[in-house]
A protein has these predicted regions:
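Sec/Tat signal peptide C-region and signal peptidase I cleavage site
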Residues: 3-7
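Membrane-proximal, glycine/serine-rich, low-complexity loop/turn segments characteristic
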Residues: 8-258, 262-343, 347-348, 530-537, ...
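Exposed, low-structure sequence patches enriched in small/polar residues
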Residues: 207, 241-303, 312, 341-347, ...
Length: 780
């Protein structure tokens, strides 16, 4: 695909006022050319960009903050998260898992790609765009060289055909060669989106395709290469440290189609225009006048004919002179007879009989013009009929050309379905298709003063198809691809209040009636109250949830060459919890406290042995359930300080798990960011500082590369405790008009302290790396 980006044709004409709009530079020397179609560039370009997300079930629109904000831009490139809260396996764009349990999502039906969520854009997180002028964002960040470096480029484009219909695309490419052996990653994603926001009909459509390839190295063979390099006679660079696996890959391809549309029944009313809409109207009016002026000038100019000869324009140079009635002219019709009254005037025309009446008509017209100039007519929906189509297709291959001797504890077949990939080679395939239709009816909130809440009801049917290896009979040397299909029916509803400034709430539920999920229930409630306190607004929010869910299909059964389980008797996992969030904007304080109880906790586990020669042997992995109750307590404080140009941001999280053997958590997790923020020549905003991430020691989840999942360390004899080591970055983050850019040195403290630079057992993080990044916004 070819992407042509055209920036402003005369950049000196446009000046950023700093308030989100551009104005013309009066000192420009560009001459006016009436035949030049780009002359509208002399006028202010409207830059209003509105972004929002949509609910995956109902298609409800929620305004969103644009993802082009400059603060912490330098941290947005890491799969460890903006606040460093994720564990990863070293290289960027590799699988990850949050250390903050309450922020972990539910296990997805095709969990193999869930750890790559950093490189994906789910429909309910994707930002749709409505823009007054074509909008383009180009972002690029880079580090390292051709042997070990990283490259990331993202191109976003959005344009509106009119004020209702918007379209665009998002192209995203992540490529990391890896500082350690056999750990390269390559991810490409492309998304096409469209939205139509009409009065009665609304539509959101998103098509995405992803192609992911990741080399798996199984970790380094000996942690002492990192923690005690002096124990070796030779010094090893990062790319010389031996790894457990080589020539092993995971490939994940997926295609997604999301369509949500609705038909509204309601009435019209008038509301005031926003400032951006006023700017857009002024721009359109000025453009129309400009076109008219250019057309008039063109018609009045002398030009050359086809032979190059001068021709006279067609405009008359003198006014015509009246010469009286032509000879022989007649008056049409009969003259009125003597004594006959003239015909009555047209009674349908407005007759102005006095100056007072003329003034009144002018006042009415002026009032109408003022109303049209400052207000708009909007449609107020009363009832909506909603349909949502959600199609997801996944295909995964775990491939290996070689496996270490004794690395796997079990082998369930020798060859793939084509009779190849025998011996120590692997070719495991897994596929999943879901076609889900949801139909809903909504009674909208706020269509009159008595409609204090909105009410929705829905019906969903989800057709699912799974494919993976199976054996015709035990002892077969080759597998065949077996298919499983099921249909799931669920019903539910929502009661919500989102309008107003003081009190909001939302209650939604889903109940499964058929399929393997029959009997599953999901209930969620959240509310918030805003009230004044000491001259500031205080927000108090609360959340509660109850889930009784069946483990996913691949948690219940999974077949591959070396990992195999059939857990058809697994119980439903039951989770219940409450959370409170207390926020004071004036003091930059936010406190979150959450309590959750889990029964039949379902988790991944793995175990292996390491001999004296650092060989990994007897690898086993699977899905397990803890029948007892697990209690989880979480408290998180966000506190920011400011003293002149000095800013200090902090996030401190405390967690306690009643069963750390199956649900391990760090007791304390800290993110801190200290920086100076100042202006250079009144245009360039600079953030100059350092941030750090730290967590206390705990038995962090290991990584099972055969299924791309983090798993509990079940081998008590060889499990590894991680933590107690800070990761420190220093950076200069800058913002100039519509451009963001940064220079960063990540992990500047490499080799200091206990040198435990691991976020997963045997997977060291990258060392000290110089990184740069830039992001441009174009409005033209």
């Amino acid at each position: 695909m070819t992407l042509n980006i055209v920036a402003q044709s005369n950049p000196t004409r446009i000046t950023d006022t700093g308030d989100g709009f551009n104005v013309t530079d009066d000192n420009s020397t560009r001459s006016f050319n009436p035949n030049h179609r780009d002359s509208v560039a002399d006028k202010e370009i409207p830059m209003g960009v509105h972004t929002w997300t949509v609910d995956r079930r109902y298609g409800d629109v929620t305004p969103a903050v644009t993802d082009t904000l400059p603060h912490l831009y330098q941290n947005s490139i890491f799969n460890t998260g903006v606040f460093g809260e994720y564990n990863t396996i070293g290289n960027n764009y590799t699988p990850r898992i949050s250390r903050i349990i309450m922020d972990r999502p539910k296990t997805s039906e095709f969990f193999f790609t869930q750890p790559y969520d950093f490189t994906m854009k789910e429909p309910d997180a994707f930002q749709f765009v409505n823009t007054l002028s074509p909008f383009t964002n180009l972002s690029y960040d880079n580090c390292g060289d051709k042997q070990n470096g990283e490259d990331h480029i993202d191109a976003k484009f959005a344009v509106n055909a009119n004020k209702r219909l918007g379209i665009g695309f998002d192209l995203d490419y992540h490529y990391a060669r890896g500082y350690y052996q056999n750990q390269s990653t390559s991810h490409f994603g492309a998304s096409l989106f469209a939205s139509y926001i009409g009065d009665k009909y609304q539509m959101h459509a998103l098509f995405s395709t992803y192609h992911r390839k990741a080399a798996e190295n199984g970790g380094i063979t000996d942690d002492n290469y990192i923690t005690h390099p002096e124990s070796y006679d030779d010094q090893f660079s990062e790319n010389e440290i031996p790894t457990v696996l080589s020539k092993n890959w995971n490939r994940n391809n997926s295609n997604h189609l999301f369509l949500s549309h609705r038909y509204n029944i309601g009435f019209y009313k008038r509301v005031a225009l926003t400032e951006a809409e006023k700017k857009a109207r002024a721009f359109a009016k000025a453009s129309a006048q400009d076109r008219k002026q250019r057309d008039n000038l063109r018609n009045n100019q002398d030009g050359d004919d086809a032979n190059g000869n001068k021709r006279r324009n067609n405009r008359r140079t003198t006014d015509p002179v009246a010469t009286g009635r032509p000879d022989g002219a007649r008056i049409a019709g009969d003259l009125p007879k003597t004594g006959e009254k003239p015909a009555d005037p047209d009674s349908t025309r407005i007759q102005v009989t006095s100056q007072q009446m003329a003034d009144s008509l002018l006042a009415v017209q002026h009032q109408k013009d003022s109303l049209d100039a400052n207000t708009k007519r909007i449609y107020v929906p009363v009832t909506s009929f909603i349909h949502t189509l959600d199609i997801n297709s996944f295909s995964r291959i775990n491939q290996a050309y070689a496996s270490p001797a004794g690395y796997y504890a079990n082998t369930y077949y020798k060859y793939d379905d084509r009779g190849i990939y025998g011996n120590d080679s692997i070719y495991d395939q897994t596929k999943y298709l879901s076609v889900k239709n949801t139909f809903a009816v909504a009674l909208m909130e706020g269509f009159n003063k008595y409609a204090k809440a909105g009410l929705k009801a829905f019906f969903s049917y989800d057709h699912r198809k799974y494919q993976m290896p199976d054996l015709l009979q035990e002892g077969d040397e080759g597998y065949y691809m077996r298919s499983w299909s099921e249909g799931l029916v669920s019903v539910g509803g929502q009661l919500s209040k989102t309008q107003g400034r003081t009190f909001h709430y939302n209650l939604d539920g889903e109940f499964f009636l058929t399929g393997s999920n029959a009997g599953s229930v999901s209930l969620n409630f959240n509310t918030d109250v805003n009230f004044p306190l000491f001259g500031d607004t205080v927000r108090l929010a609360a959340k509660a949830h109850f889930d009784r869910i069946t483990p996913t299909f691949f948690q219940r059964q999974y077949h591959s060459k070396h990992l195999w389980w059939d857990n058809g008797d697994m119980s439903k996992e039951i989770r219940s919890g409450i959370e409170g969030i207390f926020t004071i904007d004036k003091t930059h304080t936010q406190l979150r406290v959450a309590v959750e109880e889990i029964k039949n906790y379902t988790y991944f586990g793995m175990e292996y042995a390491i001999d004296e020669k650092h060989n990994f042997t007897g690898l086993q992995g699977g899905v397990y359930q803890e029948g007892g109750n697990i209690n989880l307590l979480t408290a998180q404080l966000r506190q920011n300080f400011k003293l002149g140009p000095l800013h200090w941001e902090n996030i401190v999280t405390y967690q306690h798990s009643s069963n750390k053997d199956v649900l391990p958590v760090p007791t304390v997790n800290i993110f801190t960011n200290l920086f100076f923020k100042f202006l250079v020549v009144k245009q360039l905003t600079v953030e100059l500082g350092a941030d750090a991430t730290f967590f206390t020691k705990y038995y962090a989840p290991d990584y099972l590369p055969q299924i791309s999942q983090f798993a509990v360390q079940k081998n008590v004899e060889s499990r590894v405790e991680l933590g107690g080591y800070p990761f420190v970055d220093v950076y200069a983050n800058m913002h100039l008009k519509r451009t963001r850019f940064f220079v960063m040195m990540s992990h500047v403290n490499k080799g200091m302290g206990n040198k435990m630079m691991f976020l997963a057992p045997h997977y060291p993080q990258n060392g000290k790396v110089l990184r740069i990044g830039v992001s441009w916004n174009f409005y033209n």
